[in-house]
Amino acid sequence: MENKKQSTGSEIGRLLKDNIKSYMMYIALVLIMLFFQIWSGGKFFKPSNITNLFNQAAYVAVLAIGMTLILILKHIDLSVGYVAGFTGAIAAILMQTHGVNQWLAILIVLLIGLLIGLYQGTLVMRVGVPAFVTTLAGMFIFRGLLSLSLAKTGTIVISQKGFLSLCQGFIPDIPNGTGYHLATIIIGVVAVALVIYSQVKSRRNKQKYDFDVVSTPIFIAGLVLISAIILVVCVVLASDKGIPWSAVIVGVILAIYTFLLSKTKLGRYIYGIGGNDQAAELSGVDFKLVTQFAFCSMSVLAAVSGILYASRLSSATPTAGNAFEMDAIASSYIGGTAVSGGVGKVTNAIIGTFVIMSLTNGMNLMSVDISYQYIVKGIIFIAAVAFDVRARKK
């Protein structure tokens, strides 16, 4: 009997050791949230704070999605923070100073983001300037343009309700007498069903072609953990005003990029170039065009990030964009994007974003000095990357 218990215990230990990497991010996120829930005196899981967490994370999550593509291709974009700040300022100037319709202003800003991506992508792929140098120069340029654009006015307060609702509004509810936001509950249940369906389908496809998959017990445990996170968050939000529009925007962008990377030739080309660019080129892949797309995509998403940040603050400020790129890069790497390129998922980058922003949010609740916040985030970042590097070597 004792030997049987030891055998069972060692089997569980082996399963955890062999498969923990697959769900480490989710486990870390849950532990961080529980830690701050306890040490903040129950403030972390208050509906108002979870809503605030979503709005805090939205602009970083959008950047992390785009950054994942760049990092998979073994490049980097250091300019995205101030591209976001600059485009947010342009949106505010167009609306408040020149009276441009808010939706037209958003479209113009997205086009500006596209042009920035074309400019930087051309320098990298056509001229041959390294991405690090190109985007570092871009960081200086767009920081200067942000300062110039707000030099005369300073902070510009935004009053357009539609624009502000992007990061301050909530999805409409279905009338009911329960006291809960019913639409949020329904979306949560549908989201869980979609996650289970997609994960099971993905697992079966991998098994069909004899790819490695996690063991069945760990797979089921992972599904339970992910489903529990989604349902708990949705129930908490449903007890207040429901899902914020910022979460919907991030969700739509996430769905688009998940489809792009997993279901299209372009996605396969991105992974192929990141894994071995010479082999991809010999196979007929236009790696310059693919990389150009990634930089254009990144800058457009930076513009979206700038819009969300300006909406959240109800203003455009000269300090907008500061260190955004650091949070985006950290989120992507914490989410499991390989330092060597060729590996990464945008869904995991979102989890990485919530790990970073949950740390920030929780430490703010506990009134931790900003200096210590940077130290803690740095330690978590290097620990996550070190864990990933060691796991890949094994």
Task: Give the location of each predicted region.
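Cytosolic-side transmembrane-helix boundaries in multi-pass membrane proteins
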Residues: 1-32, 154, 192-223, 286-289, ...
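Single transmembrane alpha-helix segments in multi-pass membrane proteins
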Residues: 31-39, 43-98, 120-132, 147, ...
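Inter-helical junctions in multi-pass inner-membrane proteins, predominant
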Residues: 42-52, 151, 234-247, 258-262, ...
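Loop-to-transmembrane alpha-helix initiation sites
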Residues: 56, 131, 159-161, 177-188, ...
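Alpha-helical transmembrane segments within multi-pass membrane transporters and channels
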Residues: 99-140, 352
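Transmembrane helix-bundle core of multi-pass membrane transporters
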Residues: 144-261
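Membrane-helix/interface signature in polytopic inner-membrane proteins
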Residues: 199-214, 255-295
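Transmembrane alpha-helical segments in multi-pass inner-membrane proteins
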Residues: 295-308, 312-375
